[in-house]
Amino acid sequence: MDRLPLELPSSLRQEFKSPFGPVYTDVTQFLTDAGRPIIAVGDIVTYHLQTVDYTPAVAVIDGQTKRESVDETVKAALSKHNKRIDVENQPGTISIALLEALQTAVETPESVMIVVDGEEDLATLPAVLVARPGGTVVYGQPDQGMVRIAVTPETKITMSRLLKRMDGDAAAAFDRLGVDRSGDKK
């Protein structure tokens, strides 16, 4: 039986403190450098992309930034996606629902907003695993900017290794995402 959700053990928390890629404060420069499609994780990152009229292929939001509710301007801007998937995902975990929503979203031709009841902070990890090589996953680094992760075999391996170290059934998570243990599509 699956032991999901996966939980982030305290021994692994430090590895998520440093950015997994270059940090940007200029959205236009980020878009110049980013491969497509783009998966955005975080309300403020998604909002900043939309302020320059760019809608990411997939956005994962939870209505919060730095553990506080986002303001009404951000909420209003984030309501403009073609399709919405609502999921539950508790803080410090990666739920079955989040994994399945990411898998569905990357296969959907129109933009998809995954709205998380709980916390989306760890969604970056499975987002890289399901993303198309050459694409980009972007997430917010508090008080620094937006972090660009180029989706490459190397970044998939990095995220795969982190996922394997989480508490729970990592093999079941890989299966739900439709990827093998190295992060490659099955």
Curated annotation (Swiss-Prot):
The keyword Thylakoid does not apply. Pathway: Cofactor biosynthesis; coenzyme A biosynthesis. It is an enzyme of class 2 (transferase). It catalyses: 3'-dephospho-CoA + GTP = GDP + CoA + H(+). Its EC number is 2.7.1.237. GO terms for molecular function: GTP binding; kinase activity. GTP binds at residues 43-45, 62, 120, 143. It holds the Pfam family DUF359. Keywords: Coenzyme A biosynthesis, GTP-binding, Kinase, Nucleotide-binding, Transferase. The keyword Repeat does not apply. GO terms for biological process: coenzyme A biosynthetic process. InterPro entries: GTP-dep_dephospho-CoA_kin. Catalyzes the GTP-dependent phosphorylation of the 3'-hydroxyl group of dephosphocoenzyme A to form coenzyme A (CoA). Belongs to the GTP-dependent DPCK family. This is GTP-dependent dephospho-CoA kinase. It comes from Haloquadratum walsbyi (strain DSM 16790 / HBSQ001). The lineage of its organism: Archaea, Methanobacteriati, Methanobacteriota, Stenosarchaea group, Halobacteria.
